[in-house]
Amino acid sequence: CSYGFMDDTVKAGEKYPNKLFMHCSGYKQSANVGTYFADLYQMYYLNGLMAGALTKSNRIGYVGAFPTPEVVRHIDAYALGVMATNPKAKVEVRWIYSWFDPQKAKEAAEALVAAGVDCLAFTEDTQSVVQVAEEHTAAGKQIYSFSHYSAMQKYGENSCVSGQLVDWGVMYVKIFEDIKAGKWTNADMWWLSGDKAAVLGGEFGVPINPKFVDALKTKVVLTADL
């Protein structure tokens, strides 16, 4: 279940107390309702490093679904990455107030490009932002993009630099193993890159689109954290 089903999942747990429920991305637990999520801030930071290195306009765009802790965390990590490679760049956010609305996502991305942005990232569940970047790139204006959750590089072969991917299977196997072993708890489960659930790339097995590797290699980063 995703964020919008959080309260209903808790209600289902109350209705069926002898069943176990797991809610993805929420924060409410009960005796038989647990939560889990792939925490992608590490990947967003790495994406931000790339965006800061590639931008020519020093204006970075972000399309956000809702200002929830999850999305704000993504934006903060992305902005910190941008700052590390390009302190002059600014991150501009457009909210669409929807998890899935291809048209709103497209309009927000187009508005950011019209405002001078040349890098786009997002937290919403469509490929619209990547497609907008690809369309502008095909028309002669290079716009860089970063996919979100799913493998979206196929929608932006000439614009999608990298992204964040989730291997949900790793989490599900662990959850069912804990249930089978009688070790399940309702504690919040966070999965990072070290857990192999949060993965860097616009498609699995390709951390960085090969078309942008040479350009990224020209950027030298000298910061304390790197």
Please name every model-derived segment:
Residues 1-226:
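A residue-level marker of the well-folded mature domains of exported/periplasmic proteins
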